[in-house]
Amino acid sequence: MQSAGETTLTVSSRNYSSWSMRGWLLAKLSGLPFETVMVPIDAASRAELLLLSPSIRVPCLTHEGAKVWDTLAIAEYLNEICPDARLLPQERQARAHCRSICGEMHSGFNALRSALPMNLRAHFPDFRIWSRAQHDIERIVTIWRECLTQYHGPWLFGDEIGVADAMYAPVVTRFLTYDVKLEPDIADYCMRVLAQPFVAEWIDAAKAEQDDIDELDMEF
């Protein structure tokens, strides 16, 4: 079996980096042993992180000579090398559906990213959400409700937590941080995600971090 010392996942701030959270959750869900390598948010790297510099590619998985740094690529790679984890749905149409909503998360919802950046240590009661971000929230809720209805929960694609849940987990934390009002079925799903052991572990670690970014206007 692959030892943890031979596989690394490079991530950045647990509190602020939603893509790091996604990659780490995917790696944990895969069951692949790995070592987490942190990129500190210091004065030298902060500007690059805020500008999404190509020289800072996080998360980045290194495994048996392969380097994979895009979150969707990491998801596909882990599904390939850890098939027993069933990160993607087994049925073809469900798998296509999963890839589509993950792609939508990967490339879309720019208003949400800008207006509600991830910040696990913060809480803003009665936060005022502008219309474009609200439109993104409504679309995400529609995606979740369709999946929970079609595949009967408790996770987006049925009985097993997978890629889609990991991709949308940082959005769940945003809804908590910014006090987004949700209907009971969606609130229940969010509570389920927050209670998932790997998600809870990441959040606990984020709350213990000391780094602060005063102005965060882009997701990394």
Language model features: what each stretch is:
Residues 41-42, 189, 207:
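Conserved beta-strand edge residues that scaffold enzyme active sites
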Residues 37, 71, 185, 203-204:
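Residue-level detector of family-conserved "landmark" positions at structurally sensitive sites
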Residues 206-220:
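Acidic/histidine-enriched, glycine/proline-rich intrinsically disordered or flexible terminal extensions
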Residues 105, 109-197:
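GST-like fold's C-terminal all-alpha helical module
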